[in-house]
Amino acid sequence: MVTKLKYGNTNTYFIRGAKGSILLDTDYAGTLQMFYKEIKKNGISLKDITYILATHYHPDHMGLVGELVNMGVKFLVMDTQVPNLHFSDEIFSRDKALRFLPPVPEDKAEVIACKDSRAFLAALGIDGEIVSTPSHSEDSITLVLDSGECFVGDLEPMEYMDGYEENKALQSDWEKIMSFSPRVIHYGHAPERILLQL
Protein backbone atom coordinates (compact mmCIF):
# COMPACT_ATOMS: atom_id res chain seq x y z
CA MET A 1 0.00 0.00 0.00
CA VAL A 2 1.35 3.43 -0.98
CA THR A 3 0.47 6.64 0.86
CA LYS A 4 1.57 9.98 -0.56
CA LEU A 5 2.63 12.44 2.14
CA LYS A 6 2.80 16.16 1.36
CA TYR A 7 3.93 18.56 4.08
CA GLY A 8 6.24 20.88 2.17
CA ASN A 9 7.68 21.11 -1.33
CA THR A 10 8.68 17.46 -1.77
CA ASN A 11 6.39 14.51 -2.37
CA THR A 12 7.27 11.76 0.08
CA TYR A 13 5.83 8.26 0.17
CA PHE A 14 5.04 5.66 2.81
CA ILE A 15 5.17 2.18 1.31
CA ARG A 16 3.74 -0.49 3.58
CA GLY A 17 4.51 -4.15 3.04
CA ALA A 18 3.19 -7.20 4.88
CA LYS A 19 6.27 -7.37 7.15
CA GLY A 20 7.66 -3.83 7.14
CA SER A 21 7.63 -0.45 5.47
CA ILE A 22 9.73 2.24 3.82
CA LEU A 23 9.45 6.00 4.04
CA LEU A 24 10.77 7.22 0.69
CA ASP A 25 12.26 10.72 0.92
CA THR A 26 11.57 13.48 3.44
CA ASP A 27 11.25 17.19 2.96
CA TYR A 28 13.79 19.84 3.93
CA ALA A 29 15.29 19.97 7.42
CA GLY A 30 13.16 21.82 9.95
CA THR A 31 9.86 20.26 8.81
CA LEU A 32 9.58 17.60 11.53
CA GLN A 33 6.43 19.01 13.16
CA MET A 34 4.69 19.25 9.77
CA PHE A 35 5.81 15.66 9.08
CA TYR A 36 4.22 14.50 12.36
CA LYS A 37 0.94 16.22 11.48
CA GLU A 38 0.92 14.66 8.02
CA ILE A 39 1.56 11.09 9.15
CA LYS A 40 -1.05 11.45 11.91
CA LYS A 41 -3.58 12.72 9.36
CA ASN A 42 -2.90 9.56 7.33
CA GLY A 43 -3.16 7.15 10.27
CA ILE A 44 0.58 6.45 10.36
CA SER A 45 2.72 6.52 13.49
CA LEU A 46 6.50 6.74 13.71
CA LYS A 47 6.68 3.13 14.89
CA ASP A 48 5.00 2.06 11.63
CA ILE A 49 8.06 3.21 9.66
CA THR A 50 10.66 0.44 9.44
CA TYR A 51 13.18 2.10 7.09
CA ILE A 52 13.86 5.49 5.62
CA LEU A 53 15.32 5.65 2.10
CA ALA A 54 16.18 8.81 0.16
CA THR A 55 16.01 8.88 -3.62
CA HIS A 56 19.13 11.09 -3.41
CA TYR A 57 20.92 13.29 -0.88
CA HIS A 58 19.96 16.78 -1.98
CA PRO A 59 18.63 18.77 1.01
CA ASP A 60 14.96 18.74 0.02
CA HIS A 61 14.83 14.93 -0.06
CA MET A 62 16.71 13.92 3.08
CA GLY A 63 16.32 16.78 5.56
CA LEU A 64 14.74 14.67 8.31
CA VAL A 65 16.93 11.57 7.97
CA GLY A 66 19.16 12.32 10.98
CA GLU A 67 16.25 13.09 13.29
CA LEU A 68 14.16 10.09 12.25
CA VAL A 69 17.07 7.67 12.57
CA ASN A 70 17.83 9.06 16.03
CA MET A 71 14.20 8.26 16.92
CA GLY A 72 14.60 4.62 15.91
CA VAL A 73 13.78 4.45 12.20
CA LYS A 74 16.27 2.20 10.40
CA PHE A 75 18.43 3.83 7.74
CA LEU A 76 18.55 2.16 4.32
CA VAL A 77 21.23 3.30 1.86
CA MET A 78 22.06 1.95 -1.57
CA ASP A 79 25.74 1.27 -2.26
CA THR A 80 25.70 3.84 -5.09
CA GLN A 81 24.66 6.53 -2.59
CA VAL A 82 27.42 6.19 -0.01
CA PRO A 83 29.83 8.78 -1.51
CA ASN A 84 27.07 11.42 -1.47
CA LEU A 85 25.57 10.88 1.99
CA HIS A 86 26.98 14.16 3.32
CA PHE A 87 26.21 16.28 0.24
CA SER A 88 23.83 18.52 2.21
CA ASP A 89 25.84 18.91 5.42
CA GLU A 90 27.45 22.20 4.39
CA ILE A 91 24.14 23.61 3.14
CA PHE A 92 22.46 22.93 6.48
CA SER A 93 25.46 24.21 8.47
CA ARG A 94 25.08 27.67 6.89
CA ASP A 95 21.52 28.00 8.22
CA LYS A 96 21.51 29.14 11.87
CA ALA A 97 18.18 27.43 12.53
CA LEU A 98 19.39 24.09 11.14
CA ARG A 99 23.04 23.84 12.10
CA PHE A 100 22.24 22.00 15.35
CA LEU A 101 20.28 19.23 13.64
CA PRO A 102 21.94 15.80 13.60
CA PRO A 103 23.93 14.99 10.45
CA VAL A 104 23.26 11.94 8.33
CA PRO A 105 24.17 9.04 10.65
CA GLU A 106 26.43 7.13 8.28
CA ASP A 107 27.46 4.72 11.04
CA LYS A 108 23.84 3.54 11.35
CA ALA A 109 23.31 2.98 7.64
CA GLU A 110 22.31 -0.44 6.37
CA VAL A 111 23.98 -0.42 2.95
CA ILE A 112 22.78 -2.80 0.25
CA ALA A 113 23.57 -3.20 -3.43
CA CYS A 114 20.87 -2.48 -6.00
CA LYS A 115 21.25 -6.07 -7.26
CA ASP A 116 20.19 -7.29 -3.80
CA SER A 117 17.24 -4.93 -3.45
CA ARG A 118 14.53 -7.33 -4.63
CA ALA A 119 15.36 -9.84 -1.90
CA PHE A 120 15.65 -7.07 0.69
CA LEU A 121 12.25 -5.63 -0.22
CA ALA A 122 10.68 -9.10 -0.32
CA ALA A 123 11.68 -9.57 3.33
CA LEU A 124 9.50 -6.52 4.08
CA GLY A 125 6.63 -7.93 2.04
CA ILE A 126 7.20 -5.39 -0.74
CA ASP A 127 7.45 -6.68 -4.31
CA GLY A 128 9.81 -4.59 -6.40
CA GLU A 129 13.38 -3.43 -6.77
CA ILE A 130 15.62 -0.40 -6.53
CA VAL A 131 17.72 0.70 -9.50
CA SER A 132 20.40 3.34 -9.95
CA THR A 133 19.21 6.27 -12.12
CA PRO A 134 22.15 8.70 -11.91
CA SER A 135 21.22 11.32 -14.52
CA HIS A 136 19.94 13.81 -11.92
CA SER A 137 22.74 13.12 -9.44
CA GLU A 138 25.25 10.31 -9.05
CA ASP A 139 23.39 8.95 -6.02
CA SER A 140 19.85 9.04 -7.48
CA ILE A 141 17.84 5.84 -7.32
CA THR A 142 14.38 4.76 -8.46
CA LEU A 143 12.06 2.40 -6.61
CA VAL A 144 9.98 0.27 -8.97
CA LEU A 145 7.14 -1.82 -7.54
CA ASP A 146 5.78 -4.87 -9.30
CA SER A 147 2.33 -3.25 -9.00
CA GLY A 148 3.52 -0.78 -11.64
CA GLU A 149 4.15 2.17 -9.33
CA CYS A 150 7.50 3.83 -9.90
CA PHE A 151 9.15 6.48 -7.68
CA VAL A 152 11.79 8.51 -9.52
CA GLY A 153 12.65 11.39 -7.17
CA ASP A 154 13.99 14.33 -9.17
CA LEU A 155 14.53 12.51 -12.45
CA GLU A 156 13.64 14.88 -15.29
CA PRO A 157 10.07 14.04 -16.42
CA MET A 158 9.92 11.79 -19.44
CA GLU A 159 7.62 14.19 -21.29
CA TYR A 160 10.55 16.64 -21.50
CA MET A 161 12.86 14.10 -23.13
CA ASP A 162 12.74 15.80 -26.54
CA GLY A 163 14.42 18.84 -25.00
CA TYR A 164 17.27 16.68 -23.73
CA GLU A 165 18.27 14.87 -26.92
CA GLU A 166 21.96 15.04 -26.04
CA ASN A 167 21.47 13.76 -22.49
CA LYS A 168 22.36 10.10 -22.96
CA ALA A 169 22.35 9.45 -19.20
CA LEU A 170 18.74 10.65 -18.89
CA GLN A 171 17.71 8.57 -21.89
CA SER A 172 19.40 5.55 -20.36
CA ASP A 173 17.61 6.06 -17.04
CA TRP A 174 14.20 6.24 -18.70
CA GLU A 175 14.94 3.20 -20.86
CA LYS A 176 15.81 1.28 -17.70
CA ILE A 177 12.62 2.42 -15.96
CA MET A 178 10.39 1.72 -18.95
CA SER A 179 11.78 -1.83 -19.17
CA PHE A 180 9.69 -2.52 -16.05
CA SER A 181 6.48 -1.41 -17.87
CA PRO A 182 5.48 1.06 -15.15
CA ARG A 183 1.84 2.03 -14.71
CA VAL A 184 2.28 5.22 -12.65
CA ILE A 185 5.32 7.51 -12.34
CA HIS A 186 5.58 9.31 -8.98
CA TYR A 187 7.82 12.39 -9.10
CA GLY A 188 9.52 14.19 -6.24
CA HIS A 189 7.88 17.52 -7.01
CA ALA A 190 5.45 17.12 -9.91
CA PRO A 191 2.07 15.34 -9.91
CA GLU A 192 2.14 11.63 -10.72
CA ARG A 193 1.81 10.59 -14.33
CA ILE A 194 -0.48 7.68 -15.15
CA LEU A 195 0.83 5.66 -18.08
CA LEU A 196 -1.50 2.66 -18.02
CA GLN A 197 -5.00 2.30 -16.60
CA LEU A 198 -5.81 -0.96 -14.87
Where are these regions (language model features)?
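A general structural detector for well-ordered alpha-helical segments in enzyme core domains, enriched
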Residues: 35-38, 64, 170-176
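Conserved beta-strand hairpin/beta-sheet module of binuclear metal-dependent hydrolase folds
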Residues: 1-42, 141-155
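Active-site HxH/HxHxD metal-binding segment of metal-dependent hydrolases
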Residues: 31-32, 40-114
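Metallo-beta-lactamase
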Residues: 29-30, 127-197
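Internal catalytic-core helix/loop-beta-alpha segment
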Residues: 102-135
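Short aromatic-enriched loop/helix-cap "lid" or pocket-rim segments at secondary-structure transitions
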Residues: 17, 87-90, 164, 197-198
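Glycine-rich phosphate-binding loop signature in dinucleotide/nucleotide-binding domains
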Residues: 42-47, 123-126, 180
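Residue-level marker for buried hydrophobic side chains located in beta-strands
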Residues: 22-24, 53, 75, 149-151, ...
